[in-house]
Amino acid sequence: VTIPTPRGGLARMSRRVMNLAHMLTQNARRHGGRTGFLWGDKSWTWREIDGHVSALAAGLAERGIVKGDRVLVHSKNCDEMFWSMFAAFRLGAVWVPTNFRLMPDEVAYLATASGAKAFLCHGDFPEHAKAAANPGLEFIWRIGDGGFGEKSVGEVIAEHAGAKVDNAAVDYDDPCWFFFTSGTTGRSKAAVLTHGQMAFVVTNHLADLMPGTTETDASLVVAPLSHGAGVHQLVQAARGVPTILLPSEKFDIAEAFRLIEAHRVSNIFTVPTILKMMVEHPAVDRFDHSSLRFVIYAGAPMYREDQKAALNKLGPVLVQYFGLGEVTGNITVMPASLHDPEDGPQARIGTCGFERTGMQVSIQGDDGRELKAFETGEICVIGPAVFAGYYDNPEANAKAFRDGWFRTGDLGHMDEEGFVYITGRASDMYISGGSNIYPREVEEKILTHPAIGEVAVLGVPDPFWGEVGVAVCVAREGAAAVSEAELAAFLAPKVPRYKMPKRFFFWEALPKSGYGKIPKRLVRDELEARGLLELVSKTDS
């Protein structure tokens, strides 16, 4: 293949990059005896972690996993989930983690859509393992205790103890991680993250979010490792920082603060809802959290009053960033120095910060033209942190990119100094407690109820979660009446709890456009006219 020579330059002679698992190799060499992972009463040194990862990689290779194969992982946070990430990287395979709160049918779809060859499934989810089985999935291994699967990950590691597995040679564009996101249709899409891109992401996070981080720091995990927290902990591994897990999937705030004090935790990645809960909990005053240097939050806007409360309790340690899975969190940053506890012109209320190092943001109109300061348009971004594209989804890729720019789907403006302000979303997606929720997914499940003929789900403001869903329903003609409690009980086993609408309303009809569509803005206007938005905000979460 002939590579055209750039005018006035030279075609790149090599696309080889570091395999991300080399960071583990480095830690085993330089910090081998230092603790790298803590969970409950167990801890592992970096040398032990490297050994477990090689053993798991050897087992996967023996079972036929090679470079480019996808390894699906559905698990709560635990040691073996963390090992699986580096084992996939080491082989040049692709780590495909899911949100452990998903339903079995949703995980089955992801198994098929990703083309997964192997499935590592936590023992608490036998129905997910059963649902995900398909002709392309060659084997299922169990994480932890349980009664399903060809064998357990623990058994595989024990069988291959002492194995030496080299880090596979990789190029910049070789995939390492399928980061599941969602489109406006509600179907999850696999954003392809690569070794070269993620090396930049790691470097950028260290430079912009937590400068000066070293092996003497410590990081507490308070979110699922399948998404943003997984990226955050990968960054920690680059500096030999130990990762500390909560003892169970239940978020125990007192235990979190106890761990912060006991291990002198210096950084946390979280979302505004969790941060608000931590700051308002009595434990914030019982434990010493003076070791915290960076409390990094993202995933949703944070109310100004909540910001001030967090600053007053924790000190000047808040760092905000704006970024999607497709850009691996690398769009803007609002560093601790710009989080002012006092209101005033200097406080820059409402901004999500300025462009990350090495990234460029453009506010564009529908025609792709760059808009002037304070003009509202779509937030678009270019730079090394942008993903390769969506796996096996040319239609989504065509919509997501324009003239090389990635289109976030978020609306906003930029001031004259380059600070970005998010003003809305181009889609109907809403964010509740840091989780993206796409109404169509929930609407489809509600419409399986025999008494419901039409439904519109939309996000509305909530003082606790940022936004919550409400479902406006119209009964099927001739159907028996259904109560709010009955519909909630019907929906509960069909959607994860975080996707459950906070309220269900029943109307005679939904507002429609001239084309027979149900515009969400008209539904929202009607909710407001009836005083229901205020009612929702006053309902206990």
Language model regions located:
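Gly/Ser/Thr-rich phosphate-binding loop
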Residues: 238-241, 265-269, 280-347, 360, ...
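Conserved AMP-binding A3 loop
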Residues: 45-47, 176-203
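Structural core segment of the AMP-binding/adenylate-forming
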Residues: 62-63, 90-156, 477
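Conserved AMP-binding/adenylation subdomain of ANL enzymes
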Residues: 199-218, 226-266, 281
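Conserved AMP-binding/adenylate-forming
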Residues: 16, 42, 57-104, 222, ...
